[in-house]
């Protein structure tokens, strides 16, 4: 039995609250159960120096956790003068995931930065950041389309979402919360498109190695969860 009493293939309650920032071109507060992430998408009408005069745009991401997003207060990374390795890894993952469904040439020489700030953490913050970050990115593109800067259908090739899976107490399960993640024998994150294309898989055996059969079961669970997340994204942005 999972600590949350969910079925192995049951996700937490998922919600998207759009338009939570009056300043950002796109914004979304995404909730995966008790994990809450604020995602804002900001437009800059310029690109990094290495993309100037290329005709291509850029989508990037930044990620951070508020000091009291966890059970005990975390020191702000700004106070230590540098970002931690985990932070850098996650924000690069979010950026790669969002770029996988963007036509950078159709975007033109503009940059969109998606900021993902964890307000409350209970496992799966990176997957929530990707899934909610897409909604914020979509709304930013819609804002641009309303001003005749882009056409959303040309820039946006597909949806993208992410979910965690793992083996808990010998059973493959979907969408781990912190209690499950901290005790899981295997922990994995899957990023996939709405059409089922695989963008990235991160998997680690925390205890004994997992088998190929167990991996395929985790992939099956992830695909089911991501297709549901994409349905919820489409409902949110419609």
Swiss-Prot record:
Pfam families cross-referenced by the UniProt entry: RNase_PH, RNase_PH_C
Enzyme class: transferase
Catalytic activity entry: tRNA(n+1) + phosphate = tRNA(n) + a ribonucleoside 5'-diphosphate
Biological process per Gene Ontology, one example term: rRNA processing
SUPFAM superfamilies the record matches: Ribonuclease PH domain 2-like, Ribosomal protein S5 domain 2-like
Keyword Metal-binding listed: no
UniProt superkingdom: Bacteria
This protein's UniProt keywords: Nucleotidyltransferase, RNA-binding, rRNA processing, Transferase, tRNA processing, tRNA-binding
Membrane-spanning residues: none
Annotated residues for binding of phosphate: 86, 124-126
A single MF term (Gene Ontology): tRNA binding
EC number: 2.7.7.56
Entry's family note: Belongs to the RNase PH family.
Quaternary structure and interacting proteins, as annotated: Homohexameric ring arranged as a trimer of dimers.
Function, in words: Phosphorolytic 3'-5' exoribonuclease that plays an important role in tRNA 3'-end maturation. Removes nucleotide residues following the 3'-CCA terminus of tRNAs; can also add nucleotides to the ends of RNA molecules by using nucleoside diphosphates as substrates, but this may not be physiologically important. Probably plays a role in initiation of 16S rRNA degradation (leading to ribosome degradation) during starvation.
Entry protein name: Ribonuclease PH
Organism: Chelativorans sp. (strain BNC1)
Gene name for this UniProt entry: rph
